[in-house]
Amino acid sequence: MFMNLLTQVSNAIFPQVEAAQKMSNRAVAVLRGETVTGTIWITQKSENDQAVIEGEIKGLTPGLHGFHVHQYGDSTNGCISAGPHFNPFGKTHGGPKSEIRHVGDLGNVEAGADGVAKIKLTDTLVTLYGPNTVVGRSMVVHAGQDDLGEGVGDKAEESKKTGNAGARAACGVIALAAPQ
């Protein structure tokens, strides 16, 4: 019964999301945490272009912080409700330039002495279009550095799942924005 309900909801929602995607080439995530805030924009001119991810995050400790797209656009229990990294292809964790990685693996952002991270990167797997869209999922910045799937010893197993990036400092749902 639950699966039937889930199928009905999916069939009702996804055509609307796909129609909306055809009207916009841009999405936004407003990140909120206890002390960390930010705004991240994702722009993709067409389905065949790379996504451009840019924005600013404030309130971080100086240094590197894991930066990912997570599976769910759910914040009912804080950022933990966002679930694992977005991974539609069933890969292990890696860095943004790794051949094997989750779609959501965007590496690290670096906060300066002022606690601000300015972000501008491109990505070939993140997309605003089609069945693997990041729209409706969550953008998360972590308290610690992502080891890009290269952890060793007792950190190796978790490294292949999360990059050992630590607690979730802030998150926000990735929503469609007005076209640019």
Curated annotation (Swiss-Prot):
The insertion of copper which activates the protein requires glutathione. This is independent of copper chaperone for SOD1 (CCS), which activates orthologs. Binds 1 copper ion per subunit. Transmembrane segments: none annotated. Its cofactor is Cu cation; Zn(2+). Gene3D superfamilies: Superoxide dismutase, copper/zinc binding domain (2.60.40.200). It comes from Caenorhabditis elegans. It catalyses: 2 superoxide + 2 H(+) = H2O2 + O2. It is found in: Cytoplasm. The keyword Nuclease does not apply. InterPro entries: SOD-like_Cu/Zn_dom_sf, SOD_Cu/Zn_/chaperone, SOD_Cu/Zn_BS, SOD_Cu_Zn_dom. This is Superoxide dismutase [Cu-Zn]. GO terms for molecular function: copper ion binding; protein homodimerization activity; superoxide dismutase activity.
